[in-house]
Amino acid sequence: MKIFDYEDIQLIPNKCIVESRSECDTTIQFGPKKFKLPVVPANMQTVMNEKLAKWFAENDYFYIMHRFDEEARIPFIKHMQNSGLFASISVGVKKAEFDFIEKLAQEKLIPEYITIDIAHGHSDSVINMIKHIKNHIPDSFVIAGNVGTPEGVRELENAGADATKVGIGPGRVCITKIKTGFGTGGWQLAALNICSKAARKPLIADGGIRTHGDIAKSIRFGASMVMIGSLFAAHEESPGETVELDGKQYKEYFGSASEFQKGEHKNVEGKKMFVEHKGSLMDTLKEMQQDLQSSISYAGGKDLKSLRTVDYVIVRNSIFNGDRD
């Protein structure tokens, strides 16, 4: 098995067939809806909130609302659907979450997307939750995760998952690999590659995205959608406290299993960091789209499919030319 990560890979260009990158189409059909970009902000408290979720839905971007305000989920679904927008929520696997799914079914509240969101998703509890959702609200598109192996993908798909999230602890604020010794940190792109060989349904690459070029690489190695945390954090519109350090503006960014999210020191697999303020989120999305259009033009195509077949080379840590500043 070839082991590599994002910074080890460079994609090889093909002959360009477009006059301008603006001809390149970055849209993706994912579940029942079509979106402008194959990216989704991480469902974390410092990345996504209700106001941003509404803006993303209004502008044809995919989002997943986090699950850390459980009581707000039903009002959120009602508000989104009453506004003519799609609802995309997260659930865990505790007993109360199974009851929550039954309550949605009783109230005939059917979110278009439900993400089962736990750190180690290749588990009986996730499989049981997939089956529970499909039994009670079969019309919801179920995303399950996270996994890091082909076996995990197969089992979740066989249980009824419509898409699977791949990535165990490669994110910037995730310390799973340090706390537990397990994870896909350092080989996330290779893990995505081997998982894609087993997948029959869409995969979401989750974690380890440091540059816009990593989005194109994720698609090359099997992702339909790319989940991004730190690159989406610390914008004007982002949740999180703004602080000034040495005359510069920063926003806090922490992991979903950190003590800052959990409010306790036990079973912590995330940390907090401060990310320099990045300005407008709309500008970042526009730049992401333009960079991805350029990627498609280098791939010799006009849409995302062209990225899936390009050749690549493994050149260890070459992408920064030895200069990480």
From Swiss-Prot:
Gene3D superfamilies to which the protein is assigned, alphabetical: Aldolase class I (3.20.20.70)
Signal peptide location: none
Reactions this protein catalyses: IMP + NH4(+) + NADP(+) = GMP + NADPH + 2 H(+)
InterPro entries: Aldolase_TIM, GMP_reductase, GuaC_type_2, IMP_DH/GMP_Rdtase_CS, IMP_DH_GMPRt
EC top class named in words: oxidoreductase
HAMAP family in alphabetical order: GMP_reduct_type2
Family membership: Belongs to the IMPDH/GMPR family. GuaC type 2 subfamily.
Function: Catalyzes the irreversible NADPH-dependent deamination of GMP to IMP. It functions in the conversion of nucleobase, nucleoside and nucleotide derivatives of G to A nucleotides, and in maintaining the intracellular balance of A and G nucleotides.
Record-given protein name: GMP reductase
